[in-house]
């Protein structure tokens, strides 16, 4: 049989039990020294490298490990430092300040990484002097070598890096050309250190606009050819199909393609002869974004097809394994579902099984995985019938009529204030929840604690002067995991954590079966909170699109079917809240934009399905019940009309980290529904000033009708400290009170 090689694009940073997160947050809290942080992270990086070596990968990535974000690492590598942070030593503390902000300066913008739930720190080009200033990549490569690990460096490529940047007076092409000598310098340093090849991530080349980048892409890689480094470069794409004929014409040593999320196009291009056989093909055949075990037999068939059209083949995951949990080893799952799962470590095992089969004619591990997959597939998880047609998908009356009834019922002031939903999850809150889950305290003791915490924060909100209150979500660990624990058809793991942004980790539930609402999920806590105040308290739910996008979805049903199943379940909870007397119900959809396919040909259907699912979840309420929704961290221009079509009475949107850019999206649409554009950044410990909030309000009112405008933070306050929250909300309310007097 033909020999194949195995590789990886990236490995999770978090650690099996979030050691990475805990160390970084301990350093921020001044509980450990910088030396202790460095040692902990070095040990974790070593563990990651040696684990991948254990699974006989022919090449192991370095440069994927980071203290915060790999795009921010690249910014610091090339001295792309935001102007407000310039003049300081380029070190880890500067990196953290750019990412989080400090008492003097706001953080850089935080944006979704393509259509995933990972977020990157946006590079800023205003008044920068690019140069190679901090070559951590070289240091990490040499460290891997010291462990006798056959490593390859990973770096985001110049086309993608610049496209994901903002600011500066240069054109896109000029910025790329500015960076080319710097990339060359970095490449040369890595090659001189012994790098056999360098993985250059260019996922921007799978997007709709990729053809418009082809001229500058060719110019860039021709430059690298003239510098005698191009043959050591592998252009890596993922998340969608690439224009293979163009990529094959570039003078690089290899190409990386996604054969999982490409809708079959990349294989068709290979079979059509579009791949240059003089290059190495890095084939992403194992799903890097979902947790289901591979159909190992189908992967063997795919490899056979690829071998017929290549001279050198490397198999690997479809993308970095950053997007999946580390390992199943510590889980205690029902075998009926557990046998069908594969986390990052298990995906390496799948690669090893295929390597052994093709290179050594050793089918032991292959046969074992094949039998396991077949056992899982022989089970039935399609057991319920649904009546989608009987549920309303539009409100009874237009917004103009609804808002009159809602205002009469709620009696809200000019520029009403509210928060997005969650309040700080203190160590005490987390301890009580953990003790309850592990049966160390009784249900009664836990409920008493929750009620006390709810009551305390209702009073805090009233004292500050907010107009629409929330109960604080102290019973929830995560806005999706909470619903996954309570809805039928979901599985929640114990250690299935993935990185969302910075040290923020989430534990996505796994949808394995038909989704069903079986009992009220949030009614008790919300009704209790409402009993403590005359002000309206919002019911807080997560919408069907977000629950699906932030879960690991089942793959045996179309996405739309699963999404609508979730919508029916949320609709049941919405009606239960309304029946219990809750006047305002928020159904959050922060992930609606992130799920938008990278190719525009799929946008219309995705948005149509998303809008219908949201309406399925929210349209059955009476006119006087006010429906809110919330979205965050997104570039909304492409979907602004779909946002309007949701017909939510009020939508709140993150704008603070976009530094006002988002408001431009409303210039082309007459947005005639209620809206709150977040006026300060909750992801930073920095307390906003009254002037900053007033400026944000004034800018928003240039585009938004004052009678429709709400004032709120840009996201939930779960990750902030109590004093930070109280101080920031006090500033917000005082700014609004002053504005009302104008």
UniProtKB/Swiss-Prot annotation:
It catalyses: 5-methyltetrahydropteroyltri-L-glutamate + L-homocysteine = tetrahydropteroyltri-L-glutamate + L-methionine. L-methionine binds at residues 420-422, 473, 588. It holds the Pfam family Meth_synt_1. InterPro entries: Cbl-indep_Met_Synth_N, Cobalamin-indep_Met_synthase, Met_Synth_C/arc, UROD/MetE-like_sf. One of its GO terms (molecular function) is zinc ion binding. It comes from the Bacteria. The active site is at 683 (proton donor). It is an enzyme of class 2 (transferase). The keyword Methyltransferase applies. Keywords: Amino-acid biosynthesis, Metal-binding, Methionine biosynthesis, Methyltransferase, Repeat, Transferase, Zinc. One of its GO terms (biological process) is methylation. 5-methyltetrahydropteroyltri-L-glutamate binds at residues 18-21, 112, 550, 594. CDD domains: CIMS_C_terminal_like, CIMS_N_terminal_like. Pathway: Amino-acid biosynthesis; L-methionine biosynthesis via de novo pathway; L-methionine from L-homocysteine (MetE route): step 1/1. NCBIfam families: met_syn_B12ind, PRK05222.1. Catalyzes the transfer of a methyl group from 5-methyltetrahydrofolate to homocysteine resulting in methionine formation. This is 5-methyltetrahydropteroyltriglutamate--homocysteine methyltransferase.
């Amino acid at each position: 049989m033909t020999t194949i090689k195995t590789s990886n694009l990236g490995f999770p940073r978090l650690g099996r039990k979030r050691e990475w997160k805990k160390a970084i947050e301990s350093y921020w809290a001044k509980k450990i020294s910088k030396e202790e942080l460095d040692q902990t992270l070095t040990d974790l990086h070593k563990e990651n490298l040696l684990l991948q070596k254990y699974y006989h990968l022919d090449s192991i990535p370095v440069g994927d490990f980071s203290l915060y974000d790999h795009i921010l690492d690249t910014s610091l590598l090339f001295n792309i430092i935001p102007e407000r942070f310039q003049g300081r030593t380029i070190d880890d503390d500067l990196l953290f300040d750019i990412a989080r902000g400090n008492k003097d300066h706001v953080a850089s913008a935080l944006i979704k990484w393509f259509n995933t739930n990972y977020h990157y720190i946006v590079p800023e080009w205003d008044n920068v002097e690019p140069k190679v200033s901090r070559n951590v990549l070289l240091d990490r490569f040499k460290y891997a070598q010291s462990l006798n690990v056959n490593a390859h460096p990973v770096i985001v490529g110049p086309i993608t890096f610049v496209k994901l940047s903002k600011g500066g007076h240069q054109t896109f092409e000029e910025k790329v050309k500015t960076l080319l000598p710097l990339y060359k310098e970095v490449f040369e340093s890595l090659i001189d250190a012994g790098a056999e090849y360098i993985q250059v991530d260019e996922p921007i080349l799978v997007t709709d606009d990729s053809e418009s980048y082809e001229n500058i892409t060719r110019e860039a890689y021709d430059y690298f050819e003239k510098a005698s480094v191009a043959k050591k470069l592998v252009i890596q794409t993922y998340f969608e199909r690439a224009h293979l004929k163009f990529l094959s014409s570039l003078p690089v040593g290899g190409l990386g393609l996604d054969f999982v999320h490409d809708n079959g196009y990349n294989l068709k291009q290979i079979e059509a002869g579009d791949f240059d056989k003089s290059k190495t093909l890095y084939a992403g055949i194992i799903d890097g974004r979902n947790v289901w075990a591979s159909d190992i037999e189908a992967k063997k068939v795919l490899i056979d097809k690829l071998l017929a059209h290549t001279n050198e083949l490397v198999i690997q995951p479809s993308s970095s394994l950053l997007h999946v949990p580390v390992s199943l080893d510590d889980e205690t799952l029902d075998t009926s579902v557990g046998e069908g799962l594969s986390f990052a470590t298990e995906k390496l095992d799948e690669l090893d099984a295929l390597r052994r089969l093709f290179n050594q004619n050793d089918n032991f591990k292959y046969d074992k995985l094949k039998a396991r997959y077949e056992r899982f597939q022989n089970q039935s998880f399609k057991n319920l019938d649904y009546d989608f047609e009987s549920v309303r998908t539009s409100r009874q009356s237009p917004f103009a009529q609804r808002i009159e009834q809602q205002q009469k019922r709620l009696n809200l002031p000019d520029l009403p204030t509210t928060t997005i939903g969650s309040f700080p999850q203190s160590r005490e809150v987390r301890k009580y929840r953990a003790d309850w889950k592990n049966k160390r305290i009784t249900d009664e003791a836990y409920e008493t604690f929750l009620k006390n915490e709810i009551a305390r924060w209702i009073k805090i909100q009233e004292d500050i002067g907010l107009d629409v209150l929330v109960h604080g979500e102290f019973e929830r660990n995560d806005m999706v995991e909470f619903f996954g624990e309570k809805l039928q058809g979901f599985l929640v793991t114990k250690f299935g954590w993935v990185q969302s942004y910075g040290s923020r980790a989430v534990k996505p539930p796994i949808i394995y079966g038909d989704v069903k609402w079986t009992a009220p999920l949030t009614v008790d806590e919300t009704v209790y909170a409402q009993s403590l105040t005359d002000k309206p308290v919002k019911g807080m739910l997560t919408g069907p699109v977000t629950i699906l996008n932030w879960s690991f979805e089942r793959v045996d049903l179309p996405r739309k079917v699963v999404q609508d199943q979730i919508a029916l379940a949320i609709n049941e909870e919405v009606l239960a809240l309304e029946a219990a007397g809750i006047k305002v119900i928020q159904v959050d959809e922060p992930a609606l934009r992130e799920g938008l396919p990278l190719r525009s040909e799929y946008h219309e259907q995705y948005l149509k399905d998303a809008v219908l699912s949201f309406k399925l979840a929210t349209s059955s309420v009476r006119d006087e019940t006010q429906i809110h929704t919330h979205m965050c961290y997104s570039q909304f221009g492409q979907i602004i009309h779909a946002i309007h079509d949701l017909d939510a009475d009020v939508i709140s949107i993150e704008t603070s980290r976009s530094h006002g850019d988002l408001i431009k999206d409303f210039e082309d649409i007459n947005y005639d529904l209620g809206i709150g554009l977040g006026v300060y950044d909750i992801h930073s410990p920095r307390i906003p000033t009254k002037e900053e909030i007033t400026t944000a309000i004034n800018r928003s009112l240039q585009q938004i009708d004052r009678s429709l405008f709400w004032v709120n933070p840009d996201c939930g306050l779960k990750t902030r400290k109590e004093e930070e929250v109280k101080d920031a909300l006090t500033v917000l309310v005082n700014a609004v009170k002053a504005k009302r007097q104008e």
